[in-house]
Amino acid sequence: MSLPPNIYIVGAQCTGKTTLINNLRQHFQSNSPSQQFPPPTFITEVARSVLKTHSFTASDVIIPSRSLQLQHLILLAQASAERECSTQWFISDRSGADPIAYALRYVGAEETNKLLDSDEWTEIKDRMKKGVLIVCEASEEAASWLHNDGVRLMPKDISDWVAFHTLFCDFLDKHGIEHVVLPPSIGEHEARVEFVLRYWKSKFQSGST
């Protein structure tokens, strides 16, 4: 049985990723994708689980020594979660690219090479290239979405937020990971779900996985 491509919902903080994941979950609970393959498994809360388990806080993200350790643990946890879904297809809230992008932003390129040279990144990158990557866009248009929940790291300002989005997309481009940007102008929940599904179905039907 040929499984459909995995879906990764990624990008900067406060861009609607978790809301989109929840809406995709509701969609697949109500609509079976096909009799040929099962509904997706969902990978969620990886970073938050690492923060809690290893007693990190959001402020540690900007402390280089702590941040590199944190992002390495998140990368390991993401790889482990994906391995557990090896016989299924999944939708992931974030990806292995997210911790590396944060390391590039707050630790630096030289130290981040330790993550890029890891077996986990090689494994995850290969899987991501076969999947569907949706980057939720950070932009001035979405400024009202910025909300501090007390757990996530907040950007200094809109420019910092948008700069991280640009860094993220540039990183994906550099590593040959195809992706599509979901703009905030598509704001309705149903429209955002349809955007993801349209791209996912197109990739599955084209056999480009």
Language model segments and positions:
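Hydrophobic anchor at the beta1->P-loop junction of P-loop NTPases
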Residues: I9
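Phosphate-binding P-loop
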Residues: M1-P4
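Conserved substrate/cofactor phosphate-moiety recognition/catalytic segment
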Residues: Q26-A77
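Conserved lysine of the Walker
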Residues: K17
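A glycine- and Lys/Arg-enriched "phosphate-lid" helix/loop adjacent to the NTP-binding pocket
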Residues: V107-D173, V180-G187
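Glycine-rich phosphate-binding loop used to anchor ATP phosphates in small-molecule kinases
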Residues: Q69-M128
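Hydrophobic positions on the alpha1 helix immediately C-terminal to the Walker A/P-loop
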Residues: L20
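The conserved Walker
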Residues: Q13
